Amino acid sequence: MQVPITIGTILQNRYRLISILGQGGFCRTSMAEDTGRFNELCALKEFIPQQTNANTVAKSQELFSREAAILYKIQHPQIPKFRATFEEHQRLFLLQDYVKGKTYRIILQERQVTNSLFSEVEVLTFLRQMLSVLAYIHNLGIIHRDISPENIIRRETDKIPVLIDFGVVKEIATKVQSPDLAKPLTSVGKFCYAPWEQIQLGRATANSDLYALAVTTVVLLTGKEPQELINQAKLTWNWQQWVVVSPGFAEIINKMLSRQPSDRYQSLTEVEKALAILPRVKSQQLLTTNQQLNNFSASQEATVGANLNKILALIMAFLMIISGVQLH
């Protein structure tokens, strides 16, 4: 594997690397500043090939250009704008706008510390906002393939979710490694977030994105990882053991999480219609199970504390009486 480019390096006589934001098996993402645009920040993704022979590099270049052309078509406020691709030092780079904010994974971790998980109202808003951007890319014939809390940023300026890290680089890697195989050697999508047909068969469709979005939603609601929310023996979801939501909303999520693709919603429009008829007032009155348990625990602690104080007072009074008797 190629070593990371040194921080401070200027690529294309223009993009100065500031820091490494993250790295996966096939991609390294860095923050850079565009010296040609008043040092504007941008996200620089570097494709990390597992093989470096001439045929692999040539195939990577071809696929990279093809996928870049797809990304170039995307013009949506909830997706970082694609800027350019280039090759330097025998490395392939993809440049996009930098989005300032926190991923929903980081936000969830922060909330877990204070035990204040996402409410039904919050995830309903999140879900509706995400459906809007998914409808846009699906209409372009583009599937994200890798939806998860790590790949959605809540933009700092307006608190709107922004979809990042399309499975493009990993998709390139699978095609480069196994171009002639019906089933690629490497699947695109995270285990337990992507549905079985995507992981096992490499088949990604609109409703596989919906499946991953539903998994992300229940993770935000429960604070649990997907593998903790699945009955491994029956291969069914048991997320409702951890959180209370309105029956209508639970029905929608469960349909999105159906094991068989044919049992799921087949389009974003179907999900939007189902969400549109949910009783909003009732959903706003619901608390998550964790919140209810916290309230119950606090009440119990207060009751125990009060009873303990009464007992201590009685003991003190009893001791004083005994002391008085002994003095006489």
Task: Describe every region a protein language model picked out.
Residues 33-41:
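Conserved N-lobe loop of protein kinases adjacent to the ATP-binding glycine-rich P-loop
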Residues 85:
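Activation-segment/catalytic-loop signature of the eukaryotic protein kinase fold
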Residues 138-155:
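Catalytic-loop of the protein kinase fold
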Residues 54-73:
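AlphaC helix of the eukaryotic protein kinase fold
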Residues 17-25, 29:
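Protein kinase glycine-rich loop
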Residues 126-127:
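Activation segment signature within eukaryotic-like protein kinase domains
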Residues 89-103, 107, 111:
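Conserved short submotifs of the Hanks-type protein kinase catalytic core
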